[in-house]
């Protein structure tokens, strides 16, 4: 455990500071880092209880058409990412990311509790609270983690992988529990559970506030270190940054189908029978998170070897190729008899390839952006990154609407083409910037 983290042997904070060692977790990380992981685990659990079933809830509970439900789900996803820019600016000005985390978790708990009510007005109130809560929560998780480490600390790389595992563990449990509760008890109990999960995370933050002390000296972000990394001419770096952000839009269009079109594919076109029972469609939404959680430690072990052979931009490009292959895996099922449900193996293959693509695109893409960005523009470019995710989710919903009335084969071909276009664009943009190895990224 970091020497910066105090030990309080008899207090609640002392117990929280000691629990990573008791659970045999890597003790080189501060206890405050693990506390943030608990918070994001709870937030993702609750978020996926709604996200994995939002389209179905809008159709079954509120009478939306599938097209309108997909559009609203896309708007909600987009607004969640767009809100992080003003949310991050507000928290930067006020400071104390741990306090903002606590406030955002309280808003999220109230938002999920409001979904227990069935009135349409309660739906809009809940969505509003959830959007504000997520706008504050997302940027402050990274700020809170950064506050636990000295600037340039080499442990941050491993910390981000562990953080990513916590994110996907919460997402996995959320979609799994949602499928069970909605199928057996209905929507209200599922959202009551989501609210309770958020309150548990908030309680952990309150009890452990002493190990989440803000260290102002570590809140200088990565400016001096980033300035040493990119030695390519500014014009070439700007070209790669632009290609990376555009590629992120195209990647998000593909991965954004999981909670929309692929959820409906699982519901309507997939034979979900297994051992005498039927697997809930929402479980397929959580499968990529399970796979990411399992594969992330493998990625951590092999990443340095991969980067010695392949430049980081091209690793991201290979991730986009994996997304294209994911939709190619569904082509045999789409070309089969429409009156028969397809084997779930095709959908599982698709989701597995999407998980591999996610591991290569999401963490490596953001890391590459931070390394290429001029120090004074890091905040703006990270905001542009999230805006690209928002645009991608909106376009994903629009493509999902076209999928309802169009040819599945044509939609799969479109999604394959968009992902491959992103890969080619990154490959082209990096050909001059990274001619040999990824030494500067």
Where do the PLM segments sit?
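Intracellular loop-helix junctions on the cytosolic face of multi-pass helical membrane proteins
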Residues: 2-27, 31, 151-152, 178-277, ...
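Pair of pore-lining "gating" transmembrane helices in MFS-fold secondary transporters
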Residues: 25-60, 237-258, 352, 356
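Short amphipathic helix-loop junctions that connect adjacent transmembrane helices
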Residues: 50-68, 260-281
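Central cavity-lining transmembrane alpha-helices of secondary-active solute carriers
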Residues: 71-89, 286-299
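Structural signature of the two symmetry-related core transmembrane helices
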Residues: 99-114, 314-329
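Helix-loop junctions at membrane interfaces in 12-TM secondary transporters
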Residues: 116-127, 332-348
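Intracellular juxtamembrane helix-capping segments at the cytosolic ends
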Residues: 136-150, 360-373
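Glycine-rich segments within core transmembrane alpha-helices of 12-TM secondary carriers
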Residues: 157-176, 182, 195-201, 384-396
């Amino acid at each position: 455990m970091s020497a910066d983290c105090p030990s309080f042997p008899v207090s609640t904070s002392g117990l929280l500071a000691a629990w990573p060692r008791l659970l045999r977790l890597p003790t080189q990380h501060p206890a405050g880092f693990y506390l943030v992981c608990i918070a994001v685990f709870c937030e993702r659990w609750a978020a996926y209880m709604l996200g994995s079933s939002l389209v179905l809830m809008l159709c079954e509970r509120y009478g939306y058409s599938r097209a309108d439900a997909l559009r609203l789900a896309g708007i909600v996803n987009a607004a969640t990412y767009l809100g992080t820019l003003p949310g991050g600016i507000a928290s930067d000005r006020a400071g104390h990311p741990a306090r903002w985390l606590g406030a955002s978790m309280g808003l999220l708990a109230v938002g999920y509790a409001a979904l227990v009510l069935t009135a349409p007005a309660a739906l809009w109130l809940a969505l509003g609270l959830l959007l504000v809560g997520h706008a504050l929560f997302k940027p402050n998780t990274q700020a809170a983690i950064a506050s636990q480490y000295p600037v340039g600390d080499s442990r941050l790389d491993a910390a981000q992988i562990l953080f990513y595992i916590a994110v996907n563990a919460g997402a996995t449990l959320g979609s799994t529990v949602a499928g069970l509760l909605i199928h057996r008890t209905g929507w209200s109990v599922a959202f009551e559970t989501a609210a309770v999960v958020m309150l548990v995370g908030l309680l952990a933050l309150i009890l452990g506030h002493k190990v989440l002390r803000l260290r102002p000296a570590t809140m200088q972000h990565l400016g001096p270190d980033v300035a040493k990394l990119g030695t390519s001419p500014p014009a070439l770096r700007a070209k790669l940054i632009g290609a990376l952000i555009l590629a992120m839009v195209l990647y998000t269009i593909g991965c954004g189908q999981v909670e929309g079109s692929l959820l409906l594919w699982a519901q309507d076109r997939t034979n979900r029978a297994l051992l005498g029972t039927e697997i809930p469609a929402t479980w397929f939404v959580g499968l990529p998170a399970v796979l990411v959680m399992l594969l992330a430690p493998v990625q951590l072990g092999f990443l340095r070897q991969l980067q010695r052979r392949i430049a980081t931009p091209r690793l991201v490009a290979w991730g986009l190729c994996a997304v294209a292959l994911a939709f190619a895996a569904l082509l045999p099922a789409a070309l089969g008899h429409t009156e028969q449900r397809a084997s779930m193996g095709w959908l599982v293959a698709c989701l597995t390839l999407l998980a591999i693509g996610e591991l290569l695109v999401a963490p490596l893409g953001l890391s590459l952006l931070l390394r290429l960005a001029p120090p004074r523009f890091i905040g703006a470019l990270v905001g542009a990154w999230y805006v690209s995710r928002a645009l991608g989710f909106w376009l994903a919903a629009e493509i999902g609407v076209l999928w309802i009335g169009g040819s599945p084969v044509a939609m799969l071909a479109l999604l394959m083409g968009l992902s491959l276009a992103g890969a080619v664009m990154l490959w082209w943009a990096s050909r001059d910037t990274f001619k040999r190895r990824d030494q500067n990224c």
